[in-house]
Amino acid sequence: MPIGPGSLAVIAIVALIIFGPKKLPELGKAAGDTLREFKNATKGLTSDEEEKKKEDQ
């Protein structure tokens, strides 16, 4: 069930109401940093698995 543009707009408006315009950029930055760290960690796991497969061959 994908999130469409209408749903994203509703989520953004609710977040703006709850957190206010001053706090929202800080929350966005924190979410982006967390997502970036997660992607880097999973990328590291994937490359470790690929190296292990190459060693096994």
Swiss-Prot record:
GO terms for molecular function: protein transmembrane transporter activity. It is a single-pass membrane protein. Part of the twin-arginine translocation (Tat) system that transports large folded proteins containing a characteristic twin-arginine motif in their signal peptide across membranes. TatA could form the protein-conducting channel of the Tat system. Required for YwbN secretion. NCBIfam families: PRK14861.1, tatAE. Keywords: Cell membrane, Cytoplasm, Membrane, Protein transport, Translocation, Transmembrane, Transmembrane helix, Transport. Forms a complex with TatCy. Two types of complexes exist: one composed of TatAy and TatCy, and another composed only of TatAy. Cytosolic TatA forms large complexes or aggregates. The keyword Transmembrane applies. This is Sec-independent protein translocase protein TatAy. The chain crosses the membrane at residues 1-21. GO terms for cellular component: cytosol; TAT protein transport complex. GO terms for biological process: protein transport by the Tat complex. B.subtilis possesses two minimal, substrate-specific, Tat translocases: TatAd-TatCd and TatAy-TatCy, each one composed of a TatA and a TatC protein. TatA is bifunctional and performs the function of both the TatA and TatB proteins of Gram-negative organisms. Belongs to the TatA/E family. The gene is tatAy. The keyword Transport applies. It is found in: Cell membrane; Cytoplasm, Cytosol.
